[in-house]
């Protein structure tokens, strides 16, 4: 069943009040793959604006792959993996500041919190302060992942979602409208999987998030929604309780 046919269906989660939105660095880069493309940045900003106008408490975790890909270039540069990971974390700070500037130009109060202390440009990550910002209607952008090497920003997003008691973790994808049984960009017969539980996600090795992030969500029962960030209105529809993309959660009561 296509996304348009499912658009009017109600999600079993219902309306969501507080969420963490995971944005990849690549979503800000456009077709070039690197750097920050103004048009791509504006797409994310428009979605966030709709979420804020809908009254949601929104936190964002942004990746840094458009700035620096530590895992890919560590060997080429002859540097340790831990150092490369710290360099990647700094890339997420660049993206977070770009998002903050773009949102505040549109009148959205925004705070950047970094797991690595960079007090000149971002607040340190403090859980209670982050929650207070959300309660006051500010968008909070979490930078630097977990602040530790060897952990992805997906894991950082899962961790922050649990820490701030989010209703769900929203995994934004580019031109992929959910979870597929195989890569739809390679296989023309790929089929979307609209609903699955954590064990299915982990056992089938579906390319949604890394294993550590999925295990964190599974252990605490945090719902995961995978959706296309480039389709206008998707984020707002999710927050309003519509079924969009694919849902990963506990086993449904009826199989």
UniProtKB/Swiss-Prot annotation:
The ranges of region (Involved in allosteric activation by GTP) come to: 30-35
Example GO molecular function: ATP binding
**GO biological process, any:** UDP biosynthetic process
* Pathway membership: Pyrimidine metabolism; CTP biosynthesis via de novo pathway; UDP from UMP (UMPK route): step 1/1
How is this protein organized at the quaternary level?
A: Homohexamer.
NCBIfam families, alphabetically? pyrH_bact (TIGR02075)
Protein name as annotated? Uridylate kinase
Source organism per entry reads Rubrobacter xylanophilus (strain DSM 9941 / JCM 11954 / NBRC 16129 / PRD-1)
